[in-house]
């Protein structure tokens, strides 16, 4: 007899509906860079923040963002051009959080990594040619200009691995010169109420004049106390959102799985097994 999976009670339930959500907008003001369709913006809104604007270079993504979030300020342009603007509204100089997810493909373990560093990338979608691996520093330059209370930046785990660690050292150095104490954390979405394993690194930076009152700084890379980032959420297993009785997934998804190529998934053991992982949290590529 197959086990029946009883879904755990999650502190941050993933089964929520937009019409049931109250956006209080009372926690502070946020501006989002590299905003794409607004994934991080939705998170801030659910948490009670007022996301007043965004920056995005892709016209299609900006259209999606504006349709979903109706920003007060939107800048469809290269972040390097945004940094140079001399007509930014005064409200952007009084932000609580500057948020950004600089392009990560050049640091991803599934990307070109070192072979792509320092090289301009041309996009088939038509947006401006850019050197992707330096955009993080342009984001910090914007932080230096706007002086928000807190800066939060997200990127892939690969930024912490191999030769990419030199970028992390410069990120810390540039944040210090911009006037911020910096800490970084490698977080796993499966420990935070998300039904997939997705590891991302987050840089959380506090402005010097605020952090000096409660932070102990021994050197550039050692700022204490560390922010408590332990969410301790129960993992959401495949069987919880696919089939509580542990039945295999449908033919379409199983065929997709069988036609996968090397690198599609992190679990090597899955190559010769069926897809009915009722007691496992699926890796990113299969969590659909």
Predicted regions: what is each one?
Residues 1-4:
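Extended charged
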Residues 7-147, 157-161, 166:
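Core alpha/beta nucleotide-donor-binding catalytic domains of modification enzymes
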Residues 85-95, 109-282:
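Class I S-adenosyl-L-methionine
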């Amino acid at each position: 007899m197959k086990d029946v999976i009883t879904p755990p009670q999650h502190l941050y339930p993933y089964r929520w509906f937009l019409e049931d959500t109250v956006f209080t907008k009372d926690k502070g003001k946020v501006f989002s860079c590299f905003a794409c369709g607004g994934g991080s913006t939705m998170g801030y809104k659910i948490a009670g923040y007022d996301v007043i604007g965004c920056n995005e270079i892709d016209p299609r993504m900006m259209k999606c963002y504006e349709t979903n979030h109706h920003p007060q300020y939107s800048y469809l342009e290269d972040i390097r051009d945004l940094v140079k603007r001399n007509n930014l509204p005064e409200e952007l100089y009084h932000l609580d959080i500057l948020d950004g997810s600089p392009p990560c493909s050049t640091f991803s373990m599934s990307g070109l990594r070192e072979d792509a560093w320092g090289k301009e990338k041309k996009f088939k979608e038509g947006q401006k040619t850019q050197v992707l691996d330096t955009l993080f520093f342009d984001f910090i330059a914007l932080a230096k200009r706007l002086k928000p209370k807190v800066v939060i930046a997200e990127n892939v785990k690969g930024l912490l691995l191999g030769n990419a660690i030199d970028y992390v050292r410069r990120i810390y150095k540039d944040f210090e010169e911009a006037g911020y104490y910096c800490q970084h954390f490698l977080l796993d979405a499966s420990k935070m109420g998300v039904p997939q394993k997705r590891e991302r690194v987050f840089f959380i930076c506090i402005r010097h004049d605020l952090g000096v009152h409660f932070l102990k700084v021994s050197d550039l890379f050692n700022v204490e106390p560390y922010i408590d980032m332990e969410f301790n959420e129960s993992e959401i297993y495949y069987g919880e959102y696919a089939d509580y009785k542990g039945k295999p997934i449908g033919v379409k998804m199983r065929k997709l799985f069988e036609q996968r190529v090397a690198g599609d998934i992190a679990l090597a053991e899955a190559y010769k097994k069926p897809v009915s992982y009722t007691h496992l949290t699926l890796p990113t590529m299969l969590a659909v």
